[in-house]
From Swiss-Prot:
Subunit structure: Homodimer.
EC id: 2.4.2.8
UniProt protein name: Hypoxanthine/guanine phosphoribosyltransferase
Gene Ontology molecular function, alphabetical: guanine phosphoribosyltransferase activity; hypoxanthine phosphoribosyltransferase activity
Family named by the database record: Belongs to the purine/pyrimidine phosphoribosyltransferase family. Archaeal HPRT subfamily.
GO biological process, one term: purine ribonucleoside salvage
Tagged with keyword Cytoplasm: yes
Length: 182
């Protein structure tokens, strides 16, 4: 269903960091370059996967969700709202506690109001820590989360809301495709 994405995952390098096998991929790391055909295939797949009915914003987290959200935006004319790693101190700014399997930090939401119908897209979900923080903050604002989609699902993340993905992978000394959405 996603031949360019699947081939790029099957051929991407694996880097060992301590006990962790880390896959290095254009969509998750920007290394090597992000091929336009890959990005187009992903955007088309995500548009088919997501409920975009009456959505005000495509929301994504800085940094690697940005190319995905932008490609979807260009195809749908739905504006992108980026959850940033920098605090701007603007009125209505909302903090997000970001906890991943390997780090902890803060992110910041701006420009989303009560009643805004949004979809969230991102490159990869592993543990669900970052996304659960984003969901909690968006719900506290009063945003309506219409849908959540990821390009890649890795492992068995624990997420507070239903979500979809294009491909599910397992990473050992190589990437193995578990399944794909259709």
């Amino acid at each position: 269903m996603y031949p360019i994405l699947v081939n790029s995952l099957l051929t991407c390098p694996i880097v060992k960091k301590g006990e962790y096998n880390y896959f290095v991929h254009p969509i998750t790391d920007g290394i090597p370059d992000i091929d336009p055909g890959l990005l187009r295939e992903i955007a088309v797949g995500m548009i088919r996967l997501l409920d975009l009915t009456d959505v005000k914003y495509i929301v994504t987290a800085e940094a690697m969700g940005i190319p995905i959200a932008t490609a979807i935006s260009l195809m749908t004319d739905i504006p992108v709202n980026i959850i940033r790693k920098r605090k701007y101190g603007l009125p209505g700014e909302c903090d997000v506690c970001q906890v991943t399997g390997y780090s902890k930090g803060e992110m910041y939401i701006n420009g989303i109001c009560t009643g805004d119908r949004i979809v969230i897209v991102d490159d990869v979900i592993s543990t669900g820590g970052t996304m659960n923080g984003i969901i909690k903050s968006l719900q506290s604002i009063g945003a309506e989360i219409a849908d959540i989609g990821f390009v890649i699902k890795k492992g068995n993340p624990s997420l507070k809301l239903p979500y979809s993905y294009l491909v599910s992978i397992e990473v050992t000394d190589r990437v193995r495709i578990i399944d794909q959405s259709f």
